[in-house]
Swiss-Prot record:
Pfam families: Porin_2 (PF02530). One of its GO terms (molecular function) is porin activity. Residues 1-22 form the signal peptide. Keywords: Cell outer membrane, Ion transport, Membrane, Porin, Signal, Transmembrane, Transmembrane beta strand, Transport. Belongs to the alphaproteobacteria porin family. This is Porin Omp2b. The keyword Lipoprotein does not apply. Forms passive diffusion pores that allow small molecular weight hydrophilic materials across the outer membrane. It comes from Brucella canis (strain ATCC 23365 / NCTC 10854 / RM-666).
């Protein structure tokens, strides 16, 4: 066998082997078409369909940084330096349609950090303010809502003014476990009934931080509202099962123009003490009022004043300025006069304080 024959035989063997391997080769399947995310506009901006479902999802929230100086207008004490705090709030909302109505969920997870004027981590003034908390988590089917949310005593009539220090004179506890049902008519009328567990994170006159029910009897809240293009009027009544007392609020909002609106709220408590779940103002009664003026597309001026039966007066004003869409800077100044029965609970009768808030919402 000569060299030429050997080379020809080797080449033939290689060709045959290559043909056999080609016959046995695995053919990769064609890639499946990608199903792009679909926009869902049934529940507002920012929702999209979860792929493969008819459920709409929205991820939103905000990042906030606050700097406070001057006096603490809630306690009257002198800060003697800057208090700083930061928060990242992550919110997830879902919505879908069912044979029983719209099914929604809402959750909010808050990551908080604070440092007081001495630079001590975890402190904001005299309070511990760092940590992570599941602030809200509820399910809603039609008008039925169950889970952790804010009390209907607050939300049904509407929050106080668009100021940061809005609750120097408190209008009641906020977060609570609850089962509520809201009826909404087509003529502007609505009504609510709620069974609530009681607040768990609000301090009262004596420093109490837990207003949970202590048995099987829940707190009960009921309210009525009428709303139109001119504004709204609402009333709410709450029964505190722990102290077996009740509190009530009535509020009116009026839209003077498209840019200018005013509101007024009055409240009464049968217990006449702020150390309770609902009527947390001083004495029998309290009154709040405020206004909002949208000066330009970017700047809004807000003013709020309040006074209670025990003699506390609180006034706050701010300007919320949107530098760019989603980023707002709010400088605010507040004044509190501790008169009457409040004078014995604070170090100073008069308190002036300021805060600047930087917030990016998305």
């Amino acid at each position: 066998m000569n060299i030429k024959s050997l080379l020809l035989g080797s080449a033939a063997a290689l060709v045959a082997a290559s043909g056999a391997q080609a016959a046995d080769a695995i053919v990769a399947p064609e890639p499946e078409a990608v199903e792009y995310v679909r926009v869902c506009d049934a529940y507002g901006a920012g929702y999209f369909y979860i792929p493969g479902t008819e459920t709409c999802l929205r991820v939103h929230g905000y990042v906030r940084y606050d700097v406070k100086g001057g006096d603490d207008v809630y306690t009257g004490s002198d800060r003697k330096g800057w208090d700083k705090s930061a928060r990242f709030a992550l919110r997830v909302s879902t919505g879908s349609e069912t044979e029983l109505g719209t099914l929604k969920t809402f959750t909010e997870l808050r990551f908080n950090y604070a440092a007081n004027n001495s630079g001590v981590d975890g402190k904001y003034g005299n309070e511990t303010s760092s940590g992570t908390v599941m602030e809200f988590a509820y399910i809603q089917l039609g008008g039925l809502r169950v889970g952790i949310d804010e009390s209907e005593f607050h939300t049904f009539t509407g929050y106080l003014g668009d100021v940061i220090n809005d609750d120097v004179i408190s209008a009641g506890s906020y977060r609570t476990g609850k089962i509520s049902y809201t009826f909404t008519g087509g003529n502007g009328f609505s009504a609510v009934i709620a069974l609530e567990q009681g607040g768990d994170n609000d301090g009262g006159y004596t420093g109490t931080t837990n207003y949970h029910i202590d048995g099987y009897m829940p707190d009960v809240v009921g309210g009525l509202k009428y709303a139109g293009g001119w504004g709204s009027i609402a009333g709410v009544v709450a029964y505190d099962s722990v102290i077996e007392e009740w509190a009530a609020k009535v509020r009116g909002d009026v839209n003077i123009t498209d840019q200018f609106s005013v509101w007024l709220q009055g409240a009464y408590s049968s217990a006449a003490t702020p150390d309770q779940n609902y009527g947390q103002w001083g004495g029998d009664w309290a009154v709040w009022g405020g206004l909002k003026y949208q000066a330009t597309q970017k700047a809004a001026f807000n003013l709020q004043a309040a006074h209670d039966d025990w003699g506390k007066t609180a006034v706050t004003a701010n300007v919320a300025y949107e530098l760019v869409p989603g980023f707002t800077v709010t400088p605010e100044v507040s004044y509190t006069k501790f008169g009457g029965e409040w004078k014995n609970t604070v170090a100073e009768d008069n308190a002036w304080g300021g805060i600047v808030r930087f917030q990016r919402s998305f």
